[in-house]
C-alpha cells in the first residue's frame, strides 16, 4: 500500500508544480546563504590561522561551501523540471531521469544533514586545534627577529586585546615560557643570570605577562610583573585580590567565539535541510502524480501521487534485496573473470 497517497486533478498538479518552482528558487538563495556562511567562517579561521593547527579546522567551512554550491545547482535544475512539468511535451524529456534525480536529491539531503550535525559536534576537534596552535604561538612570541615568526608577537597581543583573554588556559601559562627575547636581556645583570640558572632549560622565566593581558577597566594601574610577589607592590595580595588582568584563557575565548558561530550556522543549515526535504517530497508527489495519469491525452483527468509506492518496511526490504542482488552479481562477475584467467594461465 502506497504511503501518503493523495489525489490530484489538473488544477492541483499545476499549483504543486508552480509552488515547487518558487520553493526551488528560494532554495537557490538558501544555497547562496550556505556558501556565504562557509566563506565567512573560512575567513574567520584564516584570520587566526597562526594560532591554530589547521589540519582539521577547515572541514566545516569547506563542507558548507560545497553543499551551498550543490544546493544552487540541484535546485536550479529542479526549478527547470517543475516549470517544464506544466507542458507534457517538455516534461517527456525529463521523465526517464526523474527517479535518478530524486535519488540524488535524497543523498544530498543526507549529506546536508550530516554537515549540519558537524557544525554542532566538532567543538572537541576545534578545542584541540586551538590548544596546540596557541601553545606554539606563545613559544614564538619572543622571536621578533626570526624570519617567519617576527609577526607572532603582534598576532598574540592583538588576539589577547580583542578577545579579552590571557595565555592559553590562563595568565599563568606565561610563567612557563620565556616570552622576552634575549636581545632585550642584560646578561651582565646578576638577576638575569640567576633566573637563567634557576631552571634546567636555561630560559629566562618570570612571573609576569605581556602588556596585552592587562584589563583597562581595572581602577589600579596594571601590574604585569612580579605577580606572585606581594611585597613588590603596595597593598597587594595575589591570592585574594582580583588581579587587573584578563583571567580567561584565549583557548576558551576563541572556542566560545567559534562554537557560537558554528552553532548558529548549524541551526541555519538544519532549517535549510528541512526546506530541502519538503522540496524533495513535493517533487516525489509531482513525479508520481504525473506518472499515474491514466489518459495522457486528457489533461483534466485525476491521478494519484504518493511519497512511497509501498510501506516503509516493504520499501526497506526491497532496498536490501536489491542491494544483495547487486552484491551477488558483482561476485558472479568476479568469479567469471577468475575462471577466464585460469585457462590462460594453463
Curated annotation (Swiss-Prot):
It is a multi-pass membrane protein. The chain crosses the membrane at residues 25-43, 62-80, 100-123, 265-290. Residues 1-24, 81-99, 291-346 are cytoplasmic. The keyword Hydrolase does not apply. One of its GO terms (molecular function) is protein homodimerization activity. InterPro entries: Peripherin/rom-1, Peripherin/rom-1_CS, Peripherin_LEL, Tetraspanin/Peripherin, Tetraspanin_EC2_sf. Retina (photoreceptor). In rim region of ROS (rod outer segment) disks. Homodimer; disulfide-linked. Forms a homotetramer. Forms a heterotetramer with ROM1. Homotetramer and heterotetramer core complexes go on to form higher order complexes by formation of intermolecular disulfide bonds. Interacts with MREG. Interacts with STX3. Interacts with SNAP25. This is Peripherin-2. It comes from Rattus norvegicus (Rat).
Amino acid at each position: 500500500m502506497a504511503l501518503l497517497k493523495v489525489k490530484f486533478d489538473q488544477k492541483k498538479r499545476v499549483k504543486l508544480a508552480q509552488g515547487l518552482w518558487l520553493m526551488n528558487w528560494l532554495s537557490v538563495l538558501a544555497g547562496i546563504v550556505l556558501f556565504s556562511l562557509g566563506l565567512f567562517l573560512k575567513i574567520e579561521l584564516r584570520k587566526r590561522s597562526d594560532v591554530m593547527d589547521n589540519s582539521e579546522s577547515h572541514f566545516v567551512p569547506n563542507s558548507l561551501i560545497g553543499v551551498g554550491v550543490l544546493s544552487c545547482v540541484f535546485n536550479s535544475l529542479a526549478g527547470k523540471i517543475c516549470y517544464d512539468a506544466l507542458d507534457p511535451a517538455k516534461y517527456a524529456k525529463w521523465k526517464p531521469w526523474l527517479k535518478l534525480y530524486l535519488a540524488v536529491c535524497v543523498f544530498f539531503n543526507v549529506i546536508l544533514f550530516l554537515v549540519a550535525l558537524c557544525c554542532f559536534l566538532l567543538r572537541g576537534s576545534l578545542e584541540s586545534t586551538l590548544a596546540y596552535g596557541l601553545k606554539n604561538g606563545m613559544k614564538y612570541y619572543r622571536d621578533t627577529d626570526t624570519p617567519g615568526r617576527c609577526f607572532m608577537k603582534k598576532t598574540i597581543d592583538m588576539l589577547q586585546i580583542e578577545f579579552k583573554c590571557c595565555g592559553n588556559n590562563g595568565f599563568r601559562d606565561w610563567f612557563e615560557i620565556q616570552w622576552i627575547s634575549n636581545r632585550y636581556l642584560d646578561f651582565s645583570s646578576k638577576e638575569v643570570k640567576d633566573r637563567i640558572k634557576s631552571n634546567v632549560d636555561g630560559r629566562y622565566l618570570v612571573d609576569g605577562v605581556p602588556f596585552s593581558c592587562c584589563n583597562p577597566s581595572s581602577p589600579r594601574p596594571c601590574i604585569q610583573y612580579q605577580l606572585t610577589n606581594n611585597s613588590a607592590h603596595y597593598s597587594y595580595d595575589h591570592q585574594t585580590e582580583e588581579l587587573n588582568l584578563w583571567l580567561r584563557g584565549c583557548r576558551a575565548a576563541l572556542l566560545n567565539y567559534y562554537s557560537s558561530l558554528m552553532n548558529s550556522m548549524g541551526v541555519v543549515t538544519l532549517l535549510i535541510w528541512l526546506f530541502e526535504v519538503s522540496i524533495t517530497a513535493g517533487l516525489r508527489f509531482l513525479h508520481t502524480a504525473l506518472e499515474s495519469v491514466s489518459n495522457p491525452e486528457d489533461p483534466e483527468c485525476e491521478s494519484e501521487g504518493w511519497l512511497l509506492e509501498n510501506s516503509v518496511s516493504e520499501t526497506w526490504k526491497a532496498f536490501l534485496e536489491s542491494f544483495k542482488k547487486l552484491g551477488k552479481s558483482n561476485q558472479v562477475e568476479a568469479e567469471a573473470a577468475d575462471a577466464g584467467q585460469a585457462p590462460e594461465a594453463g
